[in-house]
Structure formats: C-alpha cells, structure tokens
C-alpha cells in the first residue's frame, strides 16, 4: 500500500479516509479492496451507480429549494468528483451546499448575469447562487468565445464553492480546447514569513486535449495539502509530515491540533527554503485572476471556512479560460500526446511501477468504477447519506 499512497500524494488532494487506495495500476479491484479491508482495517466499500448518486443529489437539493436545473448542475459536478476519485469534493460536500441554501447564505433561484462583455472577455455576476451553476455558465461562455475568436477569458464575482476546478477545464477539453479554471477560497494558508493565514488554498486547473481521448489534466491546490488531510490527522491522533502547517507562533509543526488551533496551512512547497514562496506566489496569482480582476472578496477579506453554521455570503471570485489551439501551430494534439507518452515511458524509480502524468490517477479510478458498475463509497458515507435523506424526507440512496 505504500507505493499507492505515495502516488496519490503526488497527484491528488483527497481526504485519505475516503478510499485512498483505489488508484492502483492493477484494476483487479475485488482483490485490491479485500487487501485494503484486511491490511488497513477498513471495511469493504459500498458501490453505488453513478446515475443513482446523481439522482440522490438532485432530490436533496430540490428538497431545500434549489431550482431543478441548478440541482442538476451541482450533481453533475459532485458525481464527477467521486467518479474521478476526489471523494473530499463529491458526495462528502453535499451537506455544505444544502446548509448554504437552507441558511440563506446561498440563493437557490437566481441566474448569473453578464455585467461587461467583449468578443473575447466577460465579467459575470454570480448573484450568490451555487458555485457550480456560476462555473458552468462561465466556462461555456469562455468556450463559445474561444471558438469565435481564439480565446475566452471570463471572470466572476458573487460566486460560491465551485467544487473541483478540473471539472471546468475538462469541459473545454471536450470541445477540443485548452481549459483553465481558478478560484479563491477562505483564508487558511499562511503566506511565507507571515504569522497568520491570509490566503486560500486557491486551486488551479489546466487541461489540454491529446489524441485518442487522452488528455493532460492538472488540478491542484496552491497549498501543500488540503485542509481535510490535517483534520484527518487530528482525528487519528497522528503527526503530520513536515511542510503541511504552522502553529500560532508561525513555526512549522507536525501537530495537526496546533495547526488547526490558531495556526494555518503552508503554501505549496512548505518552508521558504524548500520553495514555499513559490506556492505563496501562485496563490496570489490566483487572487489576481479571481478576486482582484472581478472585484469579489479576496485574500484575508474572504469569510472564514465553515461548512455547518455559515452566516456570511462567500462572494468568491473565479476565473475561467478557454484557448482554441487551432488558432496556433498545427498538430497540437499530436505534440501533447507525444509529451504525455514521453513522460509515461520514463523509467520509474525503485518501488514504483510507472510514471504518471496529471490526469492518469483519475483515469484509473474511472476505469475501476466502470469495471465495478459504480462508485465505491466508505460505509460511513452511505450511513451519512441515509441520515441526510431522512432529514430531508427524500428517497434513500440505493446501493448496488
């Protein structure tokens, strides 16, 4: 299991309590899951068909007042996250969206509006509706502009948590475009040499098409790890690796409790000597594209992270870009395929079986889901879904 976990640490920012061993070069999933249950003391996963997960999310969101089409957009994204293996941003996040609608900090019945527009750019007001609805509107607008004039650059204010950034960049890839998506987030990250958190994990996604349905899909935070990994370490009462967080004195700490109690996350790279200032710079770049260009909340001015009892509107800023490679040198997908294959063909280090490119772990997870006829969930996640259904008086999630 060691090589599996190392591979996941390199390419993904998952809550590792949620089936982190699923991505493996071997797709003999029954044996893999059995091994996980025996060696890691984890119960066997429960499989649920994608269509059923999708219908369940829609049922829940409509029950709390979201428009049907908005609920569908959110469900598209959450199911995609779980299908791709990003369990921290799929069904696991449903309660957050429900609480935002029920609590009135997110609006369930408006639409995004365009406030400024040129042939290549647009400035959108999300009007405080669900982030995935805003994001879908913006990336589709960017793609349309890229088809017409070669590039589409769309910024939005008044948005909310939009899920995995890769979902939007992949929309562009499906249209033969290069896609980019960025969002600012609640300030949990301590900038290099600072004492307090002032920036979000501010994710970046860049995706590009290659031949034969291959692609490059980078989807990463600009912090070293996701907040969920630190929370998980605290629950397990285990120490953390270097570079994950600092205590309230600004000193690097291996104690998750110290990081969560007045400390903060470290930028990608960790300490300054290890290049953390570069992650800090990337997080500020995302703020430039998202908060500064759009006039949304930004940096330390964004509301604090709270998934249960939120009282403030998020007013997140987001940025979506589509580039038409046909406007540049011929043979783009050929070269992209060549580069991908050159990386995959590199000799792996001892203990590893293959070199992956961004997007490969997700492809393996999707293949595994397809082979098993559904998405694998931890039994606790199914229990949570059952309790959620009962609280909303909707039909339970049906398992395979």
Question: Where in this protein do the model-derived segments appear?
Answer:
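Acidic, glycine/proline-rich low-complexity segments that act as flexible tails and inter-domain linkers
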Residues: 37-50, 55-74, 79-80, 87, ...
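Phosphate/diphosphate-binding glycine-rich loops and adjacent basic-rich segments that engage nucleotide
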Residues: 189-260
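N-terminal mitochondrial targeting presequence
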Residues: 1-35
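Glycine-rich, Trp-frequent "lid" loop and neighboring beta-strands that shape
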Residues: 153-211
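Active-site cofactor/substrate anionic-group-binding motifs, chiefly glycine-
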Residues: 89-143
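Secondary-shell segments that build the walls of catalytic and ion/ligand-binding clefts
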Residues: 238-300, 305-307
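Catalytic-core signal marking the mid-to-C-terminal active-site face
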Residues: 37-53, 288, 297-400
């Amino acid at each position: 299991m060691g090589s599996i976990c190392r591979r996941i640490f390199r390419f993904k920012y998952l809550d590792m309590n949620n089936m982190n061993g699923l991505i493996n070069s071997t797709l003999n999933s029954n044996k893999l899951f059995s091994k996980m249950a025996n060696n890691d003391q984890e119960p066997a996963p429960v499989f649920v068909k994608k269509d059923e997960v999708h219908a369940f999310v829609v049922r829940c969101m409509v029950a709390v007042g979201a428009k049907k089409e908005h609920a569908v957009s959110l469900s598209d994204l959450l199911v995609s996250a779980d299908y791709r293996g990003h369990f921290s941003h799929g069904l696991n996040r449903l309660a957050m969206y429900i609480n935002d609608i029920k609590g009135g900090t997110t609006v369930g019945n408006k639409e995004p509006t365009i406030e400024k527009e040129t042939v290549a750019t647009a400035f959108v007001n999300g009007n405080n509706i669900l982030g995935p609805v805003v994001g879908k509107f913006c990336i589709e607008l960017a793609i349309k502009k890229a088809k017409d004039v070669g590039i589409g650059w769309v910024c939005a204010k008044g948005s909310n948590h939009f899920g995995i950034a890769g979902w939007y960049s992949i929309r562009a890839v499906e249209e033969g475009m290069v896609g980019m998506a960025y969002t600012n987030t609640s300030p949990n990250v301590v900038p290099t040499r600072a004492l307090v958190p002032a920036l979000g994990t501010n994710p970046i996604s860049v995706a590009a098409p290659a031949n034969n349905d291959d692609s490059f899909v980078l989807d990463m935070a600009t912090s070293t790890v996701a907040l969920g990994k630190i929370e998980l370490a605290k629950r397990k009462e285990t120490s953390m690796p270097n570079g994950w967080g600092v205590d309230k004195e600004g000193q690097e700490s291996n104690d998750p409790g110290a990081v969560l109690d007045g400390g903060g996350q470290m930028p990608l790279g960790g300490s300054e000597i290890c290049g953390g200032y570069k992650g800090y710079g990337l997080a500020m770049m995302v703020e430039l594209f998202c908060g500064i260009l759009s006039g949304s909340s930004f940096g330390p001015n964004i509301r604090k992270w709270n998934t249960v009892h939120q009282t403030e509107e998020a007013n997140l800023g987001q940025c979506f870009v589509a580039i038409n490679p046909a406007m540049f040198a011929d043979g783009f997908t050929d070269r992209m395929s060549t580069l991908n294959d050159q990386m995959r063909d590199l000799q792996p280090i001892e203990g590893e079986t293959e070199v992956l490119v961004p997007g490969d772990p997700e492809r393996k997870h999707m293949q595994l889901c397809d082979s098993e006829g559904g998405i694998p969930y931890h039994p606790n996640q199914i229990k949570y879904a059952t309790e959620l259904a009962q609280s909303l008086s909707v039909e339970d999630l049906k398992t395979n």
